[in-house]
Every structure is written in C-alpha cells, then in structure tokens.
Amino acid sequence: EEAAALERKVPAQEQQQLQAASETFLALWKPANTADPKGAVIIVPGAGETADWPQAIGPLRQKLPNAEWSSLSITLPDLQSDAIAPRVVEATAAPKAPETGSKDATTAQPIEQAAGGEAEVADQVVAETTEEQSKADAERIFARIDAAIAYAEQQSARRIVVLGHGTGAYWAARYLSERQTAQVEKFVMVDAQAPAKAKPPLAELTPTLKLPTADIFYMDKPLDRHAALERMQASKRLKTPAFSQVALRALPDNKAEQEQLFRRVRGWLNPQTPD
C-alpha cells in the first residue's frame, strides 16, 4: 500500500488525514519557512504517482516552503475508469449449437447473428460504464481537491494555487473549469497529460479557465510539444486571459532537472524573485 509506505517514510508532523465525502486520504503538508507566507500550493499528482513522487511532486513540495509558499500534496484515488475490463462480451453466454453433426450447418447463421448482436450491446454497455465511472472518478477527485482547499484555508493561507502534474494537471483543470471556485487564484500545469479516452480533451478545457494559468511542458517530446501547441492555439482563439507557456528541456541529471522546474514555478509565483 503506497499510503502506508509514505506514512513510514515521511515525518509524522507533515502527514494529514483529510476527509473527502465518505473516505479519508493522506495529504502531506509543509508550512512555508517564513513568518509571513505568500499562500499555499496544492499539488495534485498524476496516475501512478504518490504525494511524494520523486519527479516534480516531492521536489516541489519540499522546495516551495523556501520560496515562502506552504505546500499541500494530496493522493488521488485509484480510478475505476482505468480498471475496466473490455471483454464484457464473455460475460454473456452464447447459445449452444446442437451436438448432432447433420443440423450444425442450419443453426450456425442465427447463432452468429445472436453473437454479433450481443457484441454490439456489450460495446454500448462498456461505453456507458466507462462514462459513468469517469464521472464517479471526477467526483471523488474533486472532493479531495475541495478537502485540500478547505485545509489550506484552515491554515490561514492568504492565497491558494493549484499545481497539477501529468494526469493530475488534467483533473485539476477539469475541477477548476467545472467548479470555478473563487478560492483558487492561480493554476500551474506541469507536463500535462490527459487520461486515455478523457472527455473533454485538455485543449478544450484550458481555454475555459478563468484564472492565470502557467502551462509548463518539455519540448524534447514531439507529442507533448504538439499537445502544448494545441493548447496555446485554443487559448488564443478564445482570448483566454493570462494563459502562459514555459518550455523546458529535459536534463540528464534528475536533481538539476527538478531544480530547473522549481525555479520556473517559483519565478511564476513570485515574479519579483530573480531566477
């Protein structure tokens, strides 16, 4: 269990058990290293990532307090829509053909038709189930972001920023687009990825955001570069206010790469701080 592993590794004073609807989840809180914090950054990890993931999540949550921002890194639920078995057809038993050899040929055609009809129904069931589970996933994730915002407010955070990494950036963008919560002032996407079959796509979501947004991506990957270009073009078409992009190059040394990312995030959060 990833949460149990984190509980053993992370200092107890950083661990917070937050309540979201009917479930509790682990969040990691680090207060800003100043008497006058600028606010709190809520960090949303991507699929398969923990609240202290070594890429982006952990380094940012550890470094942001030195930039006068508290950090609150949350864990996301296991998504139902990721665990769908597509072979629903097998759940429906096909009619048995007669065992007598002479009549097999006459019964083959209606059996094939029946099996074909069942496959179409099964495909529709899979599509409907996927949509239902995707909505359920979104509600569970939104409840966790709600709980994180409430906790940051309890800690008297003057300003609240949401930062999403990987698919966490997609879910955070969905949350901010659908909820349009007044408590969140800024949004940062890092290496944004959309989950498989995600609707709406990320390029349709980002132009709907009504708050300053930084889209940080890695230019080394052609697919990511193309997706970032789509997001920029969509934002220009809708004249999205305060949408900016930052292109980074991947560095061979992970520590240097994480420091580069932190400097870009810090520079956007604290414009007066020299890079």
Across the structure, where does each feature detected by a protein language model lie?
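Alpha/beta-hydrolase active-site loop
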Residues: A83-Q155
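C-terminal catalytic histidine-bearing segment of alpha/beta-hydrolase fold enzymes
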Residues: P241-D275
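N-terminal cap/lid segment of alpha/beta-hydrolase-fold proteins
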Residues: E1-A32
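Conserved alpha/beta-hydrolase
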Residues: R61-A85, E90-A91
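Gly/Ala-rich beta-loop-alpha elbow adjacent to hydrolase catalytic centers
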Residues: V162-A173
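The serine-hydrolase catalytic nucleophile loop
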Residues: A51-G58
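Short beta-strand element of the alpha/beta-hydrolase
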Residues: P37-G46
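The feature captures the conserved acid-bearing segment of alpha/beta-hydrolase catalytic domains
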Residues: T181, E185-P252
